[in-house]
Structure formats: structure tokens, C-alpha cells
Amino acid sequence: MQRAARPLVSVSDLDADKAAALKLIPIPSALEARLDAYVALLQQWQAKTNLVAPSTLPQLWTRHVADSLQLVSLMPHARRWLDFGSGGGFPGVVLACAMADVGGHVTLVERIAKKAAFLREALRVAGAPGTVILADIGDNVDRFPQALDCITARAVAPLHQLIGFAEPLMTPGTTKALFLKGQDVDAELTETTKYWKFQPKLHASVTGGQGWIVEIDHIERRT
């Protein structure tokens, strides 16, 4: 007799974490339903594909979903998003779920085929408006949308590299970048000033801890 696979995290733990996340960022019921579908699919795929660090699964909603969802409040009028290195879908799929009711669209860029397949399935299951591009970020800028409101990335590359990827796609006065960073943000900012002129704005993550969001709206390469 074949036994059902044991859940990666208990239902009660995940429900408690979800409640904590939605207390931080209240959302409409329709968006909650889309995120529920996405989270359920991620748990299924996580058993065979490493989409997020296993140690973070009990905090899936606070550590990943809410951390991603807070970007919407920083760019409430943004409709055209591009997410570098989407991986397990944070923040790309979460943003796409949020865009479903406002006519927005998210382009998700991922270089690993298995993860790109998951992202496509996640968008389908959640009913979220997005396109997945299987590509390496640095070599395929011409394949990405050119009219963008916001460019995002989370746990992908050092800040100075992310700015290098984003710079050709940013329209002054129109496009902003929101990069999620951790405790080393100050060191990354210092390193980035060696290569770029920019005036970053820092936002502390609503999820607490040592997370930061680096907001950038104008960059210029140093010569």
C-alpha cells in the first residue's frame, strides 16, 4: 500500500503564518484565493524541485509572500513589471497575482528550465497575468519589454550587477527599480557607488528582520 507524501510543513503552522502575513498586509479575498492556489502548487513542486530554502517553508507567507507583496504599495500605479531571476516566484508570481484585478502584467525572467516550467504553471493555476522568459538575464536584454514601470529582483545578484542589467531598460522619469536586499545592503551600496552614480531610497521590510528594499529611479554609469 502506497502512503501519501508527508506535508513539508504542517497545515496549522502554515495557517498561523498566513494569518500573520495578512495582518501585516491586508488583501482582498480574490487576491488571497490566487495566492492560496500559488502557495499550494509551490508546496507540491518543492518536494521535487528546490524552489525556496526548506528552512523557510514554515514562514512561507511572511518570509516570501508578504515580503514580495509589499512592493505593490511602493509602486501602487505600476502596471508593467519585470522580475529578474524569478526562481520560485518571489516576487514575480506574487506581483502577477496582485496585477490580475488592475489590468497589469509581469514578465518573469528565469534561466533554469525546471523553474521556468514551474513559473508558467503557477501563473496558470493562480490565474495571474504574466509571461515567463527562459533566459540568462545579462545576455538577453533585447528580449525583455522596453516600456516598464518597475523592475524587481530578490536574491539574484549583487546590487551593482542588478543595476547593470536594469540600466538599458529604465526610462528616466518612468521606470523605477525595487531590489529586495538583506543585512549586507550597506556594503552592497558602497560597492555599487564604484560603478554607478545613483541616489537610492531605502525602505525597511514590513516583515521585519534585516530585510531592505532599495528603490532606484535614476542611474548613470561612472566613467
Curated annotation (Swiss-Prot):
UniProt catalytic activity: guanosine(527) in 16S rRNA + S-adenosyl-L-methionine = N(7)-methylguanosine(527) in 16S rRNA + S-adenosyl-L-homocysteine
Keyword field contains Transferase: yes
The protein's name in its UniProt record: Ribosomal RNA small subunit methyltransferase G
Record GO cellular component, one term: cytosol
Compartments, record wording: Cytoplasm
UniProt: S-adenosyl-L-methionine binding residues: 85, 90, 154
Function recorded in the entry: Specifically methylates the N7 position of guanine in position 527 of 16S rRNA.
Pfam families the UniProt entry points to: GidB
UniProtKB keywords: Cytoplasm, Methyltransferase, rRNA processing, S-adenosyl-L-methionine, Transferase
Species, as recorded: Rhodopseudomonas palustris (strain ATCC BAA-98 / CGA009)
InterPro entries noted in UniProt: rRNA_ssu_MeTfrase_G, SAM-dependent_MTases_sf
Enzyme Commission code: 2.1.1.170
An annotated Gene Ontology molecular function: rRNA (guanine-N7-)-methyltransferase activity
UniProt record similarity statement: Belongs to the methyltransferase superfamily. RNA methyltransferase RsmG family.
